[in-house]
């Protein structure tokens, strides 16, 4: 026995060793890999089933094995697994491959080359089969994802010591498993093919073709399965399209991605465990489970870009923004599905993903440090690559080469610190006592107290300004940060408190009122803390996020929010109580108090968590209407420690209160409102807003509302807009009302067995009861049976109640799911109420009482109508809360309505019945019936007649009983009398007919004896008759026996008579049949005779005609079907053409009318607008200029205009502010209520905010009383405008911005943005000056540098934006270098004169015909004052159309020129013809037409004529040049594009007026004295000057023309023919050089003749020989007299346009939208409004100012303030002792709370509130020497910069502070403490 047991024990141990051995475990896991079945097996099965030939089957098998082998290898080789398991393989490889294969398998013989045996491997189809099976194995993770398998394999492999043995054994197991699988599949397929014929013969005999159809349908089945697989994959891939981001974070999305990550790690043992285990377990920890496995919360890793910075230039490795490994194996995919949730404490969105840390060495400041870096998989991949690279690299890398950048950076920092120290020492040497506090550099701390007297700061551990990011250890046992002093004393009691209670104890309001100092644990407590957490929470958005429900229902704590950010469930706010009278305060109750409202209302105390643990628990008792059951769940947000008890006054008598089992949560809320959310039974959850607070006056109404949620699944789950929702498992919807369930978790849901689990126990109980009843042996007490019966009844009642509630919910949800369902239901309810009240019920009363009258019962008209009047219809809310009788609920059409019937009508007879209870109320249904609850089941509609029917039934029962008695009594008597009477009648009849019957009988016998043949024929009939006779005889014999003997003879005679009648009938029938046979035979004979080969019968003709009709109809149907598509297409095209033509004409007419009326017929308004002294501020100008565009686009709502110009630049800020429709006035409060000088640049801005924005309440009383002053000396000067004016390429119209996408603009701006003010790369304190060098002032427009560095642009922009007080136009300083200040090129208009109108070449060229007069008026007075306008603005056009009308004419002339360098063809000449003196006016009145012409021919225009005005747009600083005259005349071919041809070949969008109107080489001709003489001169001087101007405009060529025309009058001896030829020659030759116009006419035939008229009209302007020229033109048919209007003063120019004589159409640009061009026109809007702009034209000195000595930098500061009376530069801003970089950082920190004037530029260490003077006080003392508007600029800077430049700070955060991971400083963390002060 011992031996046997020993042997058995050894065997068991041996078996266990074998099972646990590496080989067996490897075989097991290798065998398991066979069962990771996916769609890749489809190709193998398809090849075995469908492919013919062994080659394809073998190729499919080999491809399958090869692919599986690669997948097996990928389990153990991490880089291969990452390459195959990354998401890009799905998007880039899998989906296109599947789709291509799906379309490839559909067409037949796609790659069919024919059967070739020799070159079978060259056949492409075989290779495709191999590749299909090979590639598709890589997408194998489908049904059984390999993630779990891979983890199991990894665990087992790392547990084994001999890993190679494990790998080889698993490979053997894999091979065995696949061989077995393939063999089994092959055997199954062979068996199916062999037994296919037997199965088809046995079971498919009826359909012979079914087998062939199945064989042919295999290919489509596979393709369908493949397509389904593709669709399944399509829903699982990451979208490569970038997500839509919110408007606030769109600019900084790229920079924030790498910085805003939430890092959470829970460490249980130690932090610094070895990294080798993590490297070895990299495939286990970080490997994505599978390619198509379900997406889980992948570990969040840090993938920040490692940037190599050399000399502050950013360079990336190998030219990529990210390392190559991260690009290839990006675990975040294109858009990582991060789901942002709302953080309750900070009230901002914070990512809370669990992250997997990986520690790796990285160099920082030249030292190796352990940091959080790449995922383990990528790190191992880099290690493998480094090993491979090291094998091929021969040279060794020196580590000193990599240390050079770090060394240079450290040295640079050292130099900066040395300079800072030097500046501090120099300031100390000055000996000023006020500078002592400024010399010391202090660190900014966060103050936690709002009181100015207190000084409480956060500890250094928790202060982000001192300790960097929020990264520390947090104890998880208790919420120590919120415990007060009383709770700290009871540490022994509360130290082991449950975590849930600790979470509830936290008061979330503390993070908004002030952050309290966290609790410091004792030494004894620290021993018990063994679980720590490292956290770093960085909010995503810097502003408070609100939910959709908060925005819709104004639950935003009084803040004005434009749009919500967090999505909420679909809900409806229903007002349940709106009492206009005064309502008592909400009663508070303690746990001992019990409300005494009604017997049905109960109050159960519910403990409410409060902010202090010492407060006593309170209770909440809320009485609600009876329609809300007691099982409601409430959440009562309250900011106080007392609970609310709200009573709702309603007409209902029952009310329920919230039970103790309700779950109550108290989120943070303000003291102004408290909300209670209550859920209606199992369907909706409601929340009640009690808008009644202590601060509100008592007279205001109290309103209570409930927010009702639909019982539907919510897939959004409070997802923030702009963030991609989490990829979750696909949810199938197979029911109308269903939750979010996944198909992969079907085993969790017992669909089939759930019913069995419910009903089987019940069946077992019933069986037990039956058995108990039948089995008498087992005694059972009666009490137990009674209890079980009562329990069963209660269960059944509860089940029925639950079923009814579910039905009600489904009905309610069904109405909500229908579109406009509540609207339809509400209208139906109202109509049904009206029909019921006034039609149905009166008719029912009348009908019921009439029936009572008919039934001989008394009517009840009076009582019924009395009850009818008692019935009342009350409108209720959706939740059945009644309102007033004539009051409808708010938004009842959308939210829903209920109609409650009080005292429903019943007939009077019903009230007598005792069984039926009387109902006080019910609800009306859509069908007009009654129901007990809203959405309840309808009751019987015949309830009105129920009592009458009962009475009728009783009456009928009584009458039936009476009838039965009467029938039994009298019916017997009736039968007896009937028998007696009939007997007497029969006897009399027999006696009266005896004799004739006997006689007839004899005659019949004789007849039969004479005709025996007939007797034989009717033999059978005789037999029948005899049988009947016998029967009759038997009956008659019986009768005869009973009768007397005298009656026997009579009965015999009657029998014979009956027999005779039968025979007669038979005979007649036989005759009729024979006759019918004969007639039929005759008809057949007639038809045979009439048949002939040439003739057809009538029936045949009918049949043939029907056939022909069918054929014709069939042909016509086919033809109609064939032509119907073209017919419909043609029909629809015609309809669309008609519609679009009408729309285009309408829009064209509307556009023309609006443009004409606004531009030309508002003379007085335009004149007043121009004469008014510079009233166009930025806001009003933009509003006016964009009015035409907005008015035209109101109708076309589908037109999307990109008016958000925030993408332009950081400097384009004020324009965006002026465009905002809703301005948060709370941010403007410190600006409006400022006690010092006004913070507004102009009074118009203040008036604009008062009138338009509505800032009456915010404005200070002193500001309201200020009057509007003259704006001659004030201007809209802003530092960023000065910078923009130097960048003419940003001058852009906003209409052009709509055609430019933001992304394209960003790409273009990075490349093309040029800074004109900077010719040298300076450091920080610089001002770009244009070099003068004794050259023309506008040459620098074309001599600017073309490329600027990104760093330099950021530097200049930030420095100009922050430190613009260094500029000359600022409120304190002048320019750094005073150079050439004598020349001013300002935008100064003469206020008493009209503005010079500006014209842009991309706008319509207007020509107007006013009677016979052509007049163009323009004002060139004060021309030199408006010389430097940057462009021609068409929206400033002004035309004074008076009696004769004004015309603006464009004339484009091409003259002979000689080409030079840098010149282009196509000169554009702009001629302005104006009214100058009275002589010209007299000529106009005499109807003499004039036209000023300018020819640029060198011969007629000598160069020594200095008074000539020469126009050259493109080469402003060069000499006059002649241009080549083109022989071609493009106006005859394309007159509409003539101006585009001449004017837009080159784009001179920014040409000053000076360069247009003067030759720059001869610009000394016209001096300022000649142009300003009008102010001090008289009319004679004015006329002479004007005449000289006109003479200078008129060229010599014009004089020659006048001489020629005059000579024609003098020469009388010349013949008429010669004069005609000369005149015609002049018309032909001179017309091409002096006539250019553009005109469109609606009728093309009329336009030709009108074109001829205008040719002659334009030529005859200012001609002396006008009559001869006109006669010659008429003779040559060049004039059409039909279009000449008679001279009359009645016709006006407006009437001409209205009658359609001229249709002026704008010419659209056929010009490509250039980014610079568009930007230049947009910012040009603000440039026009500038009144003062001084341009210093000298290059700045080269080099960095602060790299030189400190004395030089001080000298620069002295230069800046040399024009001031005193130099107190260092007193103004205390932080100026720092370096520029440190100063910028310090200013950014200060400006975040600059709205409070007491906190601006305040020192932290020496600040006691009294000693140190603020900047405002210093500036008030120096206000005597400063201009007012410069102080206003300072205030505007303090307003604009902190409030609207946060996003710009975030953009430049990295550059300013040299931070990659935001460890030193981050702008985005400051909003974590929104109400804290920075001191």
UniProtKB/Swiss-Prot annotation:
Ranges of biased composition (kind: Basic and acidic residues): 691-701
Keywords per UniProt: Chloroplast, Membrane, Plastid, Plastid inner membrane, Protein transport, Transmembrane, Transmembrane helix, Transport
Disulfide bond positions: none
Topology term for the membrane: Multi-pass membrane protein
Gene Ontology terms: biological process: protein transport
Location relative to the cell: Plastid, Chloroplast inner membrane
UniProt cross-references to Pfam families, sorted A to Z: Ycf1
TM region(s), chain numbering: 18-38, 64-84, 87-107, 124-144, 172-192, 218-238
Impact when changing residue 1448 to Q: In strain: cv. Baekmibaekdadagi
Biased segments, Acidic residues type: 253-268, 295-305
Record's compositionally biased regions (Low complexity): 586-688
One of the record's GO cellular component terms: chloroplast inner membrane
Residues covered by region (Disordered): 245-305, 586-702
Presence of the UniProt keyword Cell wall biogenesis/degradation in the record: no
InterPro entries: TIC214
Record-stated family: Belongs to the TIC214 family.
Its biological purpose: Involved in protein precursor import into chloroplasts. May be part of an intermediate translocation complex acting as a protein-conducting channel at the inner envelope.
Additional notes on this entry: There is a partial copy of the N-terminus (positions 1-222) of ycf1 in the inverted repeat (CsCp100, ycf1-A, CAJ00805).
Subunit and interaction comment: Part of the Tic complex.
Name of the protein: Protein TIC 214
Organism: Cucumis sativus (Cucumber)
């Amino acid at each position: 026995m011992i031996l046997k047991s020993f042997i058995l024990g050894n065997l068991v141990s041996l078996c266990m060793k074998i099972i646990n051995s590496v080989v067996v475990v490897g075989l097991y896991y290798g065998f398991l890999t066979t069962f990771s079945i996916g769609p890749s097996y489809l190709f193998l099965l398809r090849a075995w089933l469908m492919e013919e030939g062994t080659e394809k089957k073998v190729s499919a098998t080999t491809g399958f094995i090869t692919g599986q082998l690669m997948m097996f290898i990928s389990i153990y080789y991490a880089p291969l697994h990452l390459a195959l398991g990354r998401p890009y393989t799905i998007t880039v490889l899998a989906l296109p491959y599947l789709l291509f294969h799906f379309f490839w398998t559909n067409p037949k013989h796609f790659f069919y080359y024919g059967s070739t045996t020799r070159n079978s491997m060259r056949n492409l189809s075989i290779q495709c089969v191999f590749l299909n099976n090979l590639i598709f194995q890589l997408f194998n993770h489908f049904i059984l994802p390999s993630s779990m398998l891979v983890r199991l394999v990894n665990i087992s492999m790392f547990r084994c010591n001999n890993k190679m043995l494990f790998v080889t054994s698993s490979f053997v197991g894999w091979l065995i498993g696949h061989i077995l699988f393939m063999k089994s599949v092959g055997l199954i397929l062979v068996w199916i093919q062999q037994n296919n014929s037997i199965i088809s013969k046995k079971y498919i005999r009826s359909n012979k073709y079914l087998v062939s159809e199945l064989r042919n349908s295999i290919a489509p089945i596979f393709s369908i399965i493949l397509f389904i697989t593709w669709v399944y994959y399509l829903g699982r891939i990451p979208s490569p399209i970038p997500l839509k981001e919110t408007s606030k974070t769109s600019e900084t999305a790229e920079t924030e991605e790498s910085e805003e990550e939430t890092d959470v790690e829970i460490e249980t043992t130690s932090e610094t465990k070895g990294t080798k285990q993590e490297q070895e377990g990299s495939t286990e920890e970080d490997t994505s489970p599978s390619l198509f496995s379900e997406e889980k919360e992948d570990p969040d890793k840090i993938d920040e870009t490692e940037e190599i910075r050399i000399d502050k230039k950013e360079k990336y490795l190998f030219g990529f923004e990210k390392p190559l490994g991260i690009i290839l194996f990006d675990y975040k995919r294109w858009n990582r599905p991060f789901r942002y949730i709302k953080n309750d404490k900070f009230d901002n969105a914070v990512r809370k993903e669990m992250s997997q840390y990986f520690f790796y060495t990285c160099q920082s400041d030249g030292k190796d440090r352990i940091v959080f870096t790449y995922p383990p998989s990528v790190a191992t991949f880099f290690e493998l690559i480094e090993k491979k690279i090291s094998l091929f690299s021969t040279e060794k890398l020196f580590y000193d080469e990599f240390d050079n950048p770090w060394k240079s950076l450290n040295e640079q920092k050292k130099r900066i610190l040395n300079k800072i120290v030097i500046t501090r020492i120099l300031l100390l040497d000055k000996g000023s006592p006020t500078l002592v506090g400024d010399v010391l550099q202090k660190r900014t701390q966060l103050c936690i107290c709002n009181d100015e007297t207190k000084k409480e700061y956060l500890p250094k551990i928790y202060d982000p300004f001192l300790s960097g990011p929020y990264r520390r250890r947090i104890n998880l046992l208790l919420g120590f940060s919120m415990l007060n002093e009383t709770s700290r004393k009871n540490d022994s009691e509360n130290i082991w408190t449950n975590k849930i209670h600790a979470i509830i104890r936290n008061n979330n309001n503390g993070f908004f009122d002030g952050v309290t100092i966290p609790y410091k644990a004792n030494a004894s407590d620290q021993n018990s803390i063994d679980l720590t957490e490292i956290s770093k929470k960085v909010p995503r958005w810097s502003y408070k996020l609100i939910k959709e429900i908060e925005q819709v229902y104004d639950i935003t704590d009084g803040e004005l929010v434009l749009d919500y950010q967090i999505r909420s469930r679909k809900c409806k706010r229903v007002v349940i109580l709106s009492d206009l009278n005064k309502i008592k305060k909400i009663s508070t109750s303690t746990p001992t108090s019990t409300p005494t409202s009604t017997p049905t209302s109960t109050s159960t105390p519910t403990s409410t968590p409060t902010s202090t643990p010492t407060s006593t628990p309170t209770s909440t008792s809320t009485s609600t209407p009876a329609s809300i059951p007691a099982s409601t769940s409430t959440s009562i947000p309250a900011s106080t420690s007392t609970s609310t008890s709200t009573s709702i006054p309603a007409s209902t008598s029952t009310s329920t209160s919230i039970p103790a089992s309700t779950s109550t949560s108290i989120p943070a809320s303000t003291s102004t409102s408290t909300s209670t959310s209550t859920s209606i039974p199992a369907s909706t959850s409601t929340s009640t807003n009690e808008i009644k607070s202590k601060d509100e006056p008592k007279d205001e109404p109290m309103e209570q509302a409930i927010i009702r949620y639909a019982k539907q699944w919510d897939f959004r789950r409070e997802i923030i807009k702009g963030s991609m929702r989490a990829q979750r498992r696909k949810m199938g919807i197979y029911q109308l009302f269903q939750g979010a369930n996944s198909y992969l978790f079907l085993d969790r849901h017992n669909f089939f067995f759930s019913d069995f689990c419910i009903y089987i126990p019940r069946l077992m109980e019933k069986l037990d009861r039956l058995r108990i009843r039948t089995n008498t042996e087992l005694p059972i007490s009666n009490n137990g049976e009674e209890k079980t019966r009562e329990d069963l009844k209660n269960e059944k009642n509860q089940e029925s109640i639950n079923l009814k509630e579910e039905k009600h919910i489904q009905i309610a949800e069904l109405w909500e799911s229908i579109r406009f369902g509540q609207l339809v239901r509400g209208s139906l309810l109202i109509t049904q109420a009206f029909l019921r009240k006034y039609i149905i019920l009166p008719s029912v009363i009348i009908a019921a009482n009439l029936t009572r009258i008919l039934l001989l019962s008394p009517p009840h008209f009076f009582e019924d109508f009395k009850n009818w009047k008692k019935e009342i219809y009350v409108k209720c809310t959706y939740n059945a809360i009644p309102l007033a009788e004539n009051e409808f609920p708010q938004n009842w059409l959308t939210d829903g309505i209920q109609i409650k019937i009080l005292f429903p009508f019943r007939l009077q007879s019903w009230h007598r019945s005792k069984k039926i209870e009387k109902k006080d109320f019910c609800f009306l249904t859509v069908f007009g019936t009654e129901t007990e609850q809203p959405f309840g089941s309808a009751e019987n509609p015949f309830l009105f007649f129920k009592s009458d029917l009962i009475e009728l039934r009783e009456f009928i029962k009584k009458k039936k009983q009476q009838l039965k008695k009467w029938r039994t009594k009298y019916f017997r008597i009736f039968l007896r009398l009937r028998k007696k009477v009939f007997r007497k009648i029969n006897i009399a009849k027999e006696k009266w007919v005896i004799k004739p019957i006997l006689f007839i009988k004899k005659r019949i016998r004789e007849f039969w004896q004479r005709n025996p043949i007939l007797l034989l024929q009717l033999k059978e009939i005789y037999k029948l008759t005899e049988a009947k006779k016998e029967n009759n005889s038997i009956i008659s014999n019986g009768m005869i026996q009973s009768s007397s003997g005298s009656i026997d003879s009579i009965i015999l005679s009657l029998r014979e008579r009956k027999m005779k009648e039968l025979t007669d009938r038979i005979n007649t029938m036989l005759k009729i049949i024979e006759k019918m046979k004969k007639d039929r035979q005759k008809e057949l004979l007639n038809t045979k005779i009439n048949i002939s080969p040439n003739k057809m019968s009538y029936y045949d003709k009918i049949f043939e005609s029907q056939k022909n009709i069918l054929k014709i109809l069939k042909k016509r149907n086919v033809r109609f079907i064939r032509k119907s598509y073209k017919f419909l297409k043609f029909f629809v095209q015609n309809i669309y053409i008609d519609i679009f033509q009408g729309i285009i004409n309408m829009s064209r007419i509307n556009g023309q009318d609006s443009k004409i009326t606004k531009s030309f017929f508002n003379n007085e308004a335009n004149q007043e607008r121009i004469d008014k002294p510079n009233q166009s501020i930025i806001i009003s100008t933009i509003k006016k200029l964009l009015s035409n565009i907005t008015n035209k686009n109101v109708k076309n709502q589908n037109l999307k205009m990109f008016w958000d110009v925030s993408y332009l630049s950081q400097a384009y800020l004020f324009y965006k502010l002026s465009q905002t429709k809703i301005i948060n006035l709370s941010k403007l409060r410190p600006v409006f209520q400022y006690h010092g000088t006004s913070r507004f640049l102009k009074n118009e801005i203040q008036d604009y905010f008062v009138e338009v924005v509505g800032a009456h309440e915010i404005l200070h009383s002193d500001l309201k009383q200020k009057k509007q002053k003259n704006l001659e000396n004030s201007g809209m000067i802003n530092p960023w405008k000065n910078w923009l004016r130097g960048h003419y390429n940003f001058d852009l119209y906003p209409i052009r911005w709509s055609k430019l996408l933001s992304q394209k603009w960003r790409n273009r701006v990075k490349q093309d943005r040029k800074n004109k003010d900077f010719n040298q790369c300076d450091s920080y304190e610089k001002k770009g000056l244009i070099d003068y060098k004794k050259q023309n002032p506008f040459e620098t427009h074309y001599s600017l540098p073309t490329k600027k560095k990104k760093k330099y642009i950021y530097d200049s922009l930030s420095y100009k934006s922050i430190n613009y007080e260094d500029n000359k136009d600022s409120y304190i300083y002048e320019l750094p270098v005073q150079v050439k200040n004598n020349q001013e090129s300002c935008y100064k208009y003469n206020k008493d004169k009209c503005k010079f109108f500006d014209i842009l070449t991309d706008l319509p060229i207007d020509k107007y015909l006013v009677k016979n007069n052509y007049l163009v008026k323009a004002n060139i007075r004060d021309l030199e004052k408006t010389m430097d306008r940057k462009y021609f603005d068409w929206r400033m056009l002004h035309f004074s159309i008076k009696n004769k009308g004004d015309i603006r004419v464009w004339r484009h002339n091409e003259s002979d020129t000689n080409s030079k360098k840098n010149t282009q063809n196509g000169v554009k000449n702009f001629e302005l013809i104006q009214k100058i003196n009275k002589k010209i006016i007299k000529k106009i009145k005499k109807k003499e037409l004039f036209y000023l012409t300018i020819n640029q021919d060198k011969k007629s225009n000598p160069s020594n004529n200095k008074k000539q005005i020469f126009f050259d747009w493109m080469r402003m600083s060069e000499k006059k040049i002649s241009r080549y005259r083109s022989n071609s005349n493009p106006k005859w071919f394309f007159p509409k594009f003539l101006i585009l041809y001449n004017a837009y070949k080159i784009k001179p969008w920014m040409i000053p007026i000076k360069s247009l109107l003067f030759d720059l080489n001869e610009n000394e001709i016209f001096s300022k004295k000649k142009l300003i003489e009008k102010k001090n001169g008289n009319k004679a001087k004015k006329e002479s000057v004007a005449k000289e101007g006109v003479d200078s405009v008129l060229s010599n060529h014009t004089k020659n023309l006048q001489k020629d025309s005059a000579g024609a009058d003098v020469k009388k001896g010349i013949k008429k023919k010669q004069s005609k030829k000369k005149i015609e020659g002049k018309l032909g030759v001179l017309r091409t050089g002096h006539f250019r116009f553009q005109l469109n006419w609606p009728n093309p035939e009329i336009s030709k003749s009108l074109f001829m008229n205008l040719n002659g009209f334009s030529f005859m302007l200012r001609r002396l020989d006008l009559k001869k020229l006109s006669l010659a033109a008429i003779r040559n048919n060049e004039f059409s007299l039909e279009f000449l209007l008679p001279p009359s003063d009645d016709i006006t120019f407006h009437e001409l346009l209205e009658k359609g004589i001229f249709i002026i159409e704008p010419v659209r640009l056929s010009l490509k939208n250039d980014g610079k061009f568009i930007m230049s026109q947009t910012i040009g809007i603000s440039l026009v409004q500038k009144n003062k702009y001084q341009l210093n034209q000298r290059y700045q000195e080269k080099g960095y100012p602060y790299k030189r000595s400190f004395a030089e930098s001080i000298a620069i500061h002295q230069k800046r303030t040399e024009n001031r009376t005193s130099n107190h530069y260092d007193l103004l801003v205390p932080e100026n002792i720092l370096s520029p970089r440190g100063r910028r950082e310090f200013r950014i920190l200060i400006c975040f709370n600059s709205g409070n004037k007491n906190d601006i530029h305040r020192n932290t260490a020496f600040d006691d509130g009294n000693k140190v003077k603020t900047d405002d006080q210093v500036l008030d003392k120096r206000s005597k020497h400063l201009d007012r508007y410069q102080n206003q600029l300072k205030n505007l800077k303090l307003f604009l910069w902190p409030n609207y430049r946060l996003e710009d700070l975030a953009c430049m955060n990295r550059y300013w502070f040299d931070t990659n991971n935001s460890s030193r400083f981050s702008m985005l963390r400051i909003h974590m403490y929104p109400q804290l002060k920075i001191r």
